[in-house]
Amino acid sequence: MTILAMTEASGGLQARTPDGRWVAVQTRPGELVVNLGDMMERWTNDRWVSTLHRVVVPETGDAGSRRMSVGFFVHPNYDAEISCIASCLDSGEVPRYPTITAGEHIRRKIEASHKAA
């Protein structure tokens, strides 16, 4: 999960839509932008989805403004089971993803990124 506090002038953050287009993420003062990781999709049975995102030189706003990013990445223990949270299932609904360990999930993501490159 990434939580961003952005100014209106900073711009440049884009998210990819399900149909493959890149769109600017609109921000307002006092609001946060939250990007979720792929494991959150599995935990929530796609109620919360991971969005591919990128940062580009802004077309509007102050492209020369200063930015500061602090990344902090947290990952469950390698052998932790990742499965749908029961409260994310409606009556009669089944999980869309099989249970997997966090380590196996990350291994598959790394393999997929190498195949795509």
What residue ranges belong to the model's regions?
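C-terminal flanking tails of non-heme Fe-dependent oxygenases
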Residues: 1-117
